């Protein structure tokens, strides 16, 4: 693969990142934010696997960092709104999954920000940390919790919040935005992990595209039933 093919189209990638931010901030059905992330993640993985230290790559890293910080700020704002409702059992079970996904993504960003001479070590650190943070099980657990499959979570996340908020649309919209954000950053870190290990990214991408369609339908169904 030639160096200039790594980005496919840097401007298109940049627009994709901006689109993610816009969707998180404005879309009424927050799950729709998940859709643009797949193309963005694929481009980022190629950049990480075939590191090129040039001006365009550095600019791309800075722009992605800015988008991530803005997404995180939105997520934190939603967290404050959701703290009005206490659901101790679900929140306690869900907290570890959320923290693991956030940590996995932070370690992935360290690869993006690494100097060429440190890149290999950062990749190794990322893989080790990813495994220590329960590998790919966080995303599957989050998916099962949203879809209502009873494994780690004693009750489906969306059902519990619906009950305790009495179907408040704003609360549920905030929750869906927060969950969509976690799926976005979790997917990027997950694909980075699979990519570094040499896994079949195409089949993994297809699997999670289907999963995210299911999540989107579930969230839209819940939001339609709100007051």
From Swiss-Prot:
One of its GO terms (cellular component) is membrane. Keywords: Membrane, Transmembrane, Transmembrane helix. It is a single-pass membrane protein. It is found in: Membrane. It comes from the Eukaryota. The chain crosses the membrane at residues 179-196. Disruption phenotype: Morpholino knockdown of the protein has no visible phenotype. Morpholino knockdown in animals homozygous for the c14 allele suppresses the c14 phenotype. One of its GO terms (biological process) is fin development. PANTHER family: PROTEIN RAPUNZEL (PTHR40472:SF7), RICIN B-TYPE LECTIN DOMAIN-CONTAINING PROTEIN (PTHR40472). This is Protein rapunzel. The gene is rpz.
